Amino acid sequence: MARNEAAIKRTLEKQICMRCNARNPQRASECRKCGYSNLRPKSKERRAA
């Protein structure tokens, strides 16, 4: 499967809220849903099921 750079950027370059798990833009400083400021980058590797 070929990896499309635009698709990777759109799906993986996100910030995840540690409180409510909402997806936020890469440059966000606080969550768009709950206002929490502790955001983590979305994992680039798939987790084992």
UniProtKB/Swiss-Prot annotation:
User: Keyword annotations for this protein?
Assistant: Ribonucleoprotein, Ribosomal protein
User: Which SUPFAM superfamilies would you find in this protein's record?
Assistant: Zn-binding ribosomal proteins
- Biological process annotations from GO: translation
Keyword Translocase assigned: no
The record, for InterPro entries, names: Ribosomal_eL40_arc, Ribosomal_eL40_dom, Ribosomal_eL40_sf, Ribosomal_zn-bd
- Example GO molecular function: structural constituent of ribosome
Fetch the Gene3D superfamilies from UniProt.
4.10.1060.50
- UniProt GO cellular component terms: ribonucleoprotein complex; ribosome
Family, according to the entry, reads as follows: Belongs to the eukaryotic ribosomal protein eL40 family.
Q: What is this protein called?
A: Large ribosomal subunit protein eL40
Question: Which organism does this sequence originate in?
Answer: Haloquadratum walsbyi (strain DSM 16790 / HBSQ001)
